[in-house]
């Protein structure tokens, strides 16, 4: 008998033992021959759930993805959000078409109407989606001796992609980088899960053209655009020149204020303004002293 025949016989023996044990003990059992299922996106798939020892089974299916929980099946009936693409049977549920949003854990829960008998089994569903072209963040120039972080990411691949980096077309090792002659003078680390490439510190040998690759074991590995990064020396001369120019300008400003003060410019400005005095203008009277003019007459 071949290996496949032995495995099939063993599975049949375990299933038969489970059924007989449940009948003897009067306790229900729930079982699935597949606790991890992988299927390409848009294909159909069945999640099997086999149970025994229940006189009146009540079946529910729960879906968990991160912090999100939803009921796919309640009391042997598919719920409304899944009714158009999921069917229920006594041996499991079948998706007519799956998307990457269906990734997660499905739990088949079987109980009696009275609630005294209960069993469950969980199945992890992975919807296979090839990675998309990753995007990178690579600085055009970095200062030698500083820390530099290059990032690579893509968000379509399922399962999540792992990342690798290349410099001038040469693969960068994720461990023991100095074993490669091209990187013997470089100090870097690569996190294949997050896609981060970290130089700490940057050396003059780190100048070059960098790109990354994303792959998840399904479909073709995808490559990012290549971007050149230059490792440059700290411009000490430029910093000194900037400080000197600033000091010269500050000195000229102080000299200008002193010169204006010594020439009395500020004193003349104070005298010219005389802020405490007010000038009042009045309209001349129509009659001045020594003159008499009849302005009106009255007749009685």
UniProtKB/Swiss-Prot annotation:
Annotated positions of the Phosphoserine modification: 282, 285, 288
Cytoplasmic domain ranges by topology: 260-300
Ranges that cross the membrane: 239-259
Keywords, ordered alphabetically: Cell junction, Cell membrane, Disulfide bond, Glycoprotein, Immunoglobulin domain, Membrane, Phosphoprotein, Repeat, Signal, Tight junction, Transmembrane, Transmembrane helix
Membrane topology: Single-pass type I membrane protein
Annotated Gene Ontology cellular component terms: bicellular tight junction; cell-cell junction; plasma membrane; protein-containing complex; slit diaphragm; tight junction
Gene Ontology BP terms: actomyosin structure organization; cell adhesion; cell differentiation; cell-cell adhesion; cellular response to mechanical stimulus; epithelial cell differentiation; establishment of endothelial intestinal barrier; intestinal absorption
Glycosylation site list: 185
Membrane-side (Extracellular) residue stretches: 27-238
Subunit structure: Interacts with the ninth PDZ domain of MPDZ. Interacts with the first PDZ domain of PARD3. The association between PARD3 and PARD6B probably disrupts this interaction. Interacts with ITGAL (via I-domain). Interacts with CD151.
Family to which this protein belongs: Belongs to the immunoglobulin superfamily.
Name of the protein in question: Junctional adhesion molecule A
Organism: Rattus norvegicus
The organism's taxonomic lineage, starting at the top: Eukaryota, Metazoa, Chordata, Craniata, Vertebrata
Underlying gene: F11r
